[in-house]
Swiss-Prot record:
Protein name: Endoribonuclease YbeY
Native species: Clostridium tetani (strain Massachusetts / E88)
Record's GO cellular component terms: cytoplasm
Function comment: Single strand-specific metallo-endoribonuclease involved in late-stage 70S ribosome quality control and in maturation of the 3' terminus of the 16S rRNA.
Main location: cytoplasm
Organism taxonomic ancestry: Bacteria, Bacillati, Bacillota, Clostridia, Eubacteriales
Amino acid sequence: MIYIDNRQNKIKAQEDLDKLINEIIDYALKKEEVDIGYEISVIYVDNEIIKEINNDTRGINKETDVLSFPMLEYPKGRVFSESYREYSFGVEYLNEGNLVLGDIVLSLEKALEQSKEYNHSFLREVCYLVVHSVLHLLGYDHIDEEEKVIMRKKEEEILESFNISRG
């Protein structure tokens, strides 16, 4: 189950964007071997709100494009498919039988700015940010170069499956 909550009014969120985000998240989770019903919340915000959340949660007082709040903990360098595939989750991890993977907070305002900066579509930018964030919910990171290469490759593979590419 994917919940999309639009908490901003600066960028008009299209129904077809929500549909595509649902499809991409579902595809990414299947590709990453999430073999249980799941719950993810995607919250659209503006730059002001994401700046406040970024400051409150990370101590960084500036706007960003997307924030990921995973509900599961992962050993360093391990991801969902290595840590939790076929795992028997306790009720504290479930909501109505679905595994709560976490929340994605996405600034549509920042996504629009970045799409112009990188000279590609708003749709491509939003989809990239969602895929990036979903991979964080599944334990991927990009702190060291080796992890970054793996994560970038996964992002591009997922986007290419939807014919979404740079440019």
